[in-house]
Amino acid sequence: MTTSRLPFSLTKTKNFYEELNNWIGDVFYDILPEKGFDLRDEQVFMAFQLERAFKEKKVMFAEAGVGTGKTLVYLLFAISYARYVGKPAIIACADETLIEQLVKKEGDISKLAEHLDLKIDTRLSKSHEQYLCLKKLEKTMQRSDDDKWLDLYESLPSFVHESQAMQRFYPYGDRKQYANLSNEEWSDVSYDSFQDCLTCDMRHRCGLTLSRDYYRKSTDLIICSHDFYMEHVWTEESRKREGQLPLLPDHSAVVFDEGHLLEFAAQKALTYRVKQSTLELFLERLLQNDIREEFAELIEDALLANDEFFYVLSEESKEVAGSHRLEIKNDHRVKKAADELCRLLDKIGEALVFESEMYTIDQYELSVVEEYVEQMAYSLSLYQKDAISWLEKKEAESTFVVMPRTVAEVLGEKVFSKKIPYIFSSATLSEGGSFDYIADSLGIHDYLSLTVDSPYDYDEQMSINLYAKTDMDAEQKTAETIETIKRYKGRTLVLFPSFEELNEFKELSAAWELPYPIFFEGDEEISSLVEKFQEEEETVLCSVHLWEGLDIPGDALKNVTIWSLPFPPHDPVFTAKRNGAKKDPFEEVDLPYMLLRVRQGIGRLIRSNQDSGSIHIYAGGENERIIDEVKKVLPVEPHMM
């Protein structure tokens, strides 16, 4: 216990939780209102309910409406509890954009530090893909003569290029530091799961490695994404077996911000990705050693089976509109090829045990190959048990992806069985007032819950136009959207269900000569676009991923346009969910997903008692039943257009 760092004093007559309760009351009733913050009954109610979850070390679903100030509440508890226990608390956000929202200059952590005179040790633990890969940068520089790559290389810290004594190493390579690169450009130089980091000669000068070392030493908060936290959970044991540290250090508590999105993050983290060239790389490395002829022939057979599997997979896959995932059609033929490859990989796994006793292969290299072969064999066996699967293609490279259908059992065992506080925070956690659906999907059997409404007067602050009478095409919607942008002099967030629709608007809007800059997700690092949008008021932001969490109070945002109803794509992941529905796939999968996204999208507009503006929802072409369902989740009566 590090009581000297607690933001309040402990006495002999009262325990930590009693003193914490008193301090939280002082903060919300006296200290923050004196600094200009609103006194919100909903926020105070949530705070005193949350104390029970920390005291009893339980799971809590904290459903709090927009504007409750839930982030301030869970931050105060997380910081205090981390200092009391002596281990950092984890704040897991839905994605990297929301991490940046939390730690920006005018974000909630900065507000608490300033107004409560606290020094908060906050460190970011971003997903691997958010970091530069030195090896990929070298390859990109070799095949492209664009000056931007040379400029990037020369901007790297001196210790990357030089080997000398007494050098000071520090974290670098974060995506945010290269905001000018588009998403496509970034993918050419960023980490991907097929990089062989364990044997990389630049490993100890790598920005990802140095960043990990840095955030592990946090004493208060480590902020990561849901994906990264789940990757930590699934890889913790295997990393220990390989002699590596887990991705995250031992921690005191976990807060899942936008917690309704955790199930998909868990599925994503449990996903196995198999690239055609990776097995070739590992097995051909073995062939360079002095191995038995019988083993060499087995490797050759496996390489042929690998080529055959990916050939069949490519032949039997088709593209899906609105998704980068290719659907596998003739499952039987692919499974037959997978069965043969899996059989040979199992044989290689057995042979590797024998080879390890011959000492003809470097033991570390052997363990790396063994781990990969085992993982690939498991992926193929998972596929044969009807897991969710698809194919991805980039340039000439194919990647086979396998994802489990459910994660409830493994989550219940590996995560929620631990006796620490787990807080789920979101405006949309329950269905019809019940938290059973989300609890069951995550393997949670014992939990606390609370629900508080939004403190905002939506009838006074918001108007909604629902375009449902006529089915507009993209050109008509573009013209209407441009008119609303002009009316509000920019200050508009346009939300799209997919990049295809965003790019269509991007192309059509280029013909209009608007005096207001339009920022499109994908053109730059997204948190830098959000920053520009907030600082330069007369601008427009178009996004696919900002339905949740975006917090822009004030005059920078006066208008939110929902381009079309955000139904899930018809890709393998949601097709599997539909196939698993008990009665009606549309009622159980598509409709709830769409309504949740609409509620979240609307929540971007009003972020303070002083905010006002309008929502425009394009739902033309949908039947009356769907329109009625949309109207039920709207906070005010819409104007039907």
Curated annotation (Swiss-Prot):
Binds 1 [4Fe-4S] cluster. It catalyses: Couples ATP hydrolysis with the unwinding of duplex DNA at the replication fork by translocating in the 5'-3' direction. This creates two antiparallel DNA single strands (ssDNA). The leading ssDNA polymer is the template for DNA polymerase III holoenzyme which synthesizes a continuous strand; ATP + H2O = ADP + phosphate + H(+). GO terms for molecular function: ATP binding; ATP hydrolysis activity; DNA binding; DNA helicase activity; iron-sulfur cluster binding; metal ion binding. Gene3D superfamilies: P-loop containing nucleotide triphosphate hydrolases (3.40.50.300). A motif (DEGH box) lies at residues 257-260. SUPFAM superfamilies: P-loop containing nucleoside triphosphate hydrolases (SSF52540). One of its GO terms (biological process) is nucleobase-containing compound metabolic process. Its EC number is 5.6.2.3. [4Fe-4S] cluster binds at C133, C197, C200, C206. Its cofactor is [4Fe-4S] cluster. Residues 29-303 form the Helicase ATP-binding domain. Keywords: ATP-binding, DNA-binding, Helicase, Hydrolase, Iron, Iron-sulfur, Isomerase, Metal-binding, Nucleotide-binding. ATP binds at A64, G65, V66, G67, T68, G69, K70, T71. Belongs to the helicase family. DinG subfamily. Might be a 5'-3' DNA helicase. This is Probable ATP-dependent helicase YpvA.
